[in-house]
Amino acid sequence: MIFTKKVYILLLLGIAIAVFLAILFTQQISIIATLLFDLTVLGLAVWDSRRVKPQRVQVKRYPLHRLSIGRENPVVLSVQSWEKPARIILRDYYPLEFDVSKPTLTATLKPSSTEELTYTIKPNSRGEFQWGDIQIRQLSPWGLAWHDWHVSASQKVAVYPDLVGLRSLSIRLSLENTGTMRQKRRLGTGTEFAELREYGVGDDIRLIDWKATARSTRPLVRVLEPEKEQTLIILLDRGRLMTAQVQGLKRFDWGLNSTLALALAGLNRGDRVGIGVFDREVITWIPPERGQHQLSKLIERLTPIQPVLLEPDYFGAVTRIVNQQTRRALVVVITDIIDVTASAELLSALKRLTPRYLPFCVTLRDPQVDILAHTPTQKIEATYERAVALDLIAQRQVAFAQLKQKGVLVLDAPASQISDQLIERYLQLKARNLL
């Protein structure tokens, strides 16, 4: 039970009455009258608070399943009142590691009504987290006290990679495949026949299917699509550089999100997708397979993995791929680069992949470094920071240039944009038949 401001105002009023009685009567009468008044106020407040108990609202939290890291995940509480209106304050004991939109929720319910209260939480790390109970405060009928109690709602909730982003990507790819966005498909792109469609202005006349046209009343053209059943291998570094925080998440988490997004795109395009995670050794290897069941396997196997403070063995990871994968494949290495010296082993490892495989190096850039490098300043300390940022960018560009000279594809993008840009590059490679 918690007294409201109304009780404290009444108690202060008792003091004012005591002063007034002390003037008119004796001090003893004033003290006795004040004590009786205050005790009456407190007694009424306690009694008023107990009147809430039979009218306690019913509160429950809708079941929480998979939460997505780095996303605003909605949490919904259902509140039901009885015959009388209810004014309540709720506090849900979410994990302290999460960012939350509303620490407390307030509502005023009409008699015999149900209301849903929603807040969002944003996890910044993966794993299993403990949710606590729900604390409820309900205002008494006379407004003298808050009746306070807890509802048991403890549960464990798992935080996964960005499943929300995967769902959005899946919808987008499905729309492209089913024809809703098929107008974006370019004629003649790819090597496999996809469909026939009516000739349109600007279409290449070399793509007209004359036999089909002869059977029809209008000219028809062939639509080609990229070859399917190719192999996509993704190697995800979980070494020391991937433990750094970038835009609220670890580099590894950004890399894991982009890994799963690329895997989804590959599976959607009919390719065989395999993934390896490595530090000093390959700690997880999931052989290439086709089909949507492969995505579920990838999510379950990769979600528990965390980055470690170990230097990665690029050569060892690539060697394992070379020994196990005989077919030509696109090999995507998701990592980070500091300078030419630090990336020497990476360059040596990726050179081993050519020409049998198509190596693709993907790095996650920290936007804060770009901001420091391109923000003029007059302060000495900030000038030093800017110089370091400019040097870091220059060293990375030299390393990227060396990779490109050896036939390695390179993508360096801000961490928050890496998934979209990586998928776009992959679809371009498929369209150009470079695999």
Please name every model-derived segment:
Residues M1-K60:
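Extracellular/lumenal glycan-associated context and N-glycosylation machinery
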Residues L39-H293, R328-T335, T341, S348-R352, ...:
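An amphipathic, basic-hydrophobic helix/alpha-beta surface used to engage anionic
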Residues E281, L364-Q368:
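Short beta-alpha junction loops
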Residues I286-P312:
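Short, charged loop segments at secondary-structure junctions
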Residues S296-L298, Q368-V398:
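Acidic, Ser/Thr-rich peripheral helices and adjacent loops at domain boundaries
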Residues P312-R365, D412, R432:
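Exposed acidic/Ser/Thr-rich ligand/metal-binding surfaces
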Residues L409-A415:
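Short acidic-hydrophobic, aromatic-tinged amphipathic segments that line or gate anion-handling sites
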Residues I418-L435:
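C-terminal "exit" segments of structured domains
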